[in-house]
Amino acid sequence: MYGYPLPTTPRLSQEEAAGRLYPFTDVVSPANFTVKAMHLLFSFASQDRQTAWCDTPLFPALFRRAGYDTLMFDNQTTFTLENDDVWDQEIRHFLYHPRLSPQLFTHCNADKYPFDEGLLADFDRQDLRFRNPHRLTIFHLMGQHVAYRNRFPAEAGYFTADSIPEYSTSGLRRSRDERRIVADYDNAVRYNDRVVGEILDRCRTRDAVVVYLSDHGEGVVDYAHRNGRVHDAALSADGCRP
């Protein structure tokens, strides 16, 4: 959709061609890691005004007070206290604190799935339970987090190392192993496109608006012989653009 030479977003490109999707072209994330971005996304806090998320309302709570059912399907967080992953704990104590979560969500999923399509089956089950016509549904996908090869099922593998040019757009010469990593990332993007397409299919006959925010970017052997990103709050705008 944004000029990448390989077909990583066939579903969303199809929606755009049909005039059903309107891509934003000038959007900057407030952070390049999930927790900080979600602090600002779910609240009325502002990066520009340097306000804290906990000093403003969280928008799902406003929907609840307005009479909406608010359903949350999260595939990045486990809901057991035994998980000691620091990022998992930050999200869990932010959105899923026992005192806060009931004010935000009518329903949260109890299970985490190997792949994001598991959330769709969970949604289908809950869709039969909640009949309120006024509903806010949030999907928090695992997306394209490392390790990329773990973010799509084997049958969704579309690209191989042979699909990836030897030289990156910056002129970096990539080994075959590095091109395989890029192919894994591209496959994760393409699988994510499939999941988002299935969400759109479920909303097609409803009076609904779908807003999709893509995963934070990753440097995948573009400018250096490495992949991933720096978890740093002090970032330039260019470093956060998709």
What feature does the model see in each segment?
Residues 1-242:
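Catalytic domains that recognize anionic headgroups
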